[in-house]
Each structure stands twice: as C-alpha cells, then as structure tokens.
Amino acid sequence: MKVIASTLRKGNVVDKDGKLYVILTAENIHPGKGTPVTQLDMRRITDGVKISERYRTTEQVERAFVEDRDHTFLYQDGEGYHFMNPENYEQLAVPEDVVGDAAPYLQEGMVVTLSTHNGVPLAIELPQRVTLEIVETEPVTKGQTASSSYKPAILSNGVKTSVPPHITTGTRVVIMTADGAYVERAKD
C-alpha cells in the first residue's frame, strides 16, 4: 500500500524497486529554505546492504504488508533460532542476523513478537523486561547503603550491566532488554 514518506517509522518495511527494505532510522528534516524531506536509512532484507534515501515528505512510498505475531522461543542450533506459533504449533527457524542484539536475552519459553513478510522472518521484538541472575559481581562492603553509586555485574546470559551495591552474586534482577539497564531486584 502507498503511504506518505513522512509517516514512515523505524521497523517499517518498504518495497523499493521490487526489493524489500527495513527502515533503521527515519527523520523528517525541515530546512529553513526549501522543501521538507524525510531521510531514511534502510537495510535490504535479502542481503543486508544498507542504503540511505531522501524523499519529499509528501512523496508516495510503497509500504510492504508485515504480519506481527506472538511466537514462543524454543531453542537455538546451527540452523538458527527456532520459534513456535502457539496458535497452530508451526515452527519457524529465524537466522542469526535477524535476531541480532536480542540473542542474549532469549530464554526458553519466552514469548516474542515476530514480524514476517510472506512467511519470511524480518525482525523480532522482545518483552521490555527480562529476569536474569547475577553470576559475577563485587562483594557487598559493610556500611554501604543504597546510594546512587553502581558496581559492574555480569548476568547469566553474559551481558555486562551496572547494579546497586547491595546486589550480590546469585540475586535475580529485572533488566531492560533495550539497553541492558538494571531496573529492580526480582520479586520471586
């Protein structure tokens, strides 16, 4: 379907010259003089080539139909990451480059939103927060109170983060998947 270029956002998929591109960044630029434009940084889905395009904000762009469905993460092997559609129990192997930075946060049984176009996986969206265990951090020093100073820690998935001084090794914590930031101690 055709849409105005200024309405495109990150994560949308556009059809340009018969090839599909996923939008990495979309910025509307209004110069003091001249016509406003929309600057799009895109990645070709088939081979990962990145391109940058400028469109007049009123120009029509072909937006591809993308289906977003919840899938359950099962396991990872040489073929990629395997997900199951809970409605019809169909399994889908997603390549490593599509999973990208989300890979360390995937846990068996986790429900994610999988975006597909004609059955081809394009992107996955994780839950905003995940609960993980601290496997390594500095010991608690007596007299330290809950202050604004943070100490480095390594999570059970290998990601490094910063946690408050009262958190010890073995503690389960809630982490933001977007940036790996500590939110709170897990309530379980």
UniProtKB/Swiss-Prot annotation:
GO process terms (BP): peptide biosynthetic process
Compartment(s) where it occurs, according to its Swiss-Prot or TrEMBL record: Cytoplasm
GO annotations of cellular component type: cytoplasm
Organism domain of life: Bacteria
InterPro entries: Elong-fact-P_C, NA-bd_OB-fold, Rib_uL2_dom2, Transl_elong_fac_P/YeiP, Transl_elong_KOW-like, Transl_elong_P/YeiP_cen, Transl_elong_P/YeiP_CS, Transl_elongation_fac_P
Swiss-Prot/TrEMBL keywords: Cytoplasm, Elongation factor, Protein biosynthesis
Example GO molecular function: translation elongation factor activity
Associated pathway: Protein biosynthesis; polypeptide chain elongation
SUPFAM superfamilies: Nucleic acid-binding proteins, Translation proteins SH3-like domain
Keyword Cytoplasm set for record: yes
Main function: Involved in peptide bond synthesis. Stimulates efficient translation and peptide-bond synthesis on native or reconstituted 70S ribosomes in vitro. Probably functions indirectly by altering the affinity of the ribosome for aminoacyl-tRNA, thus increasing their reactivity as acceptors for peptidyl transferase.
PANTHER family, per the entry: ELONGATION FACTOR P, TRANSLATION ELONGATION FACTOR KOW-LIKE DOMAIN-CONTAINING PROTEIN
Family according to the record: Belongs to the elongation factor P family.
Record's protein name: Elongation factor P
Protein's gene: efp
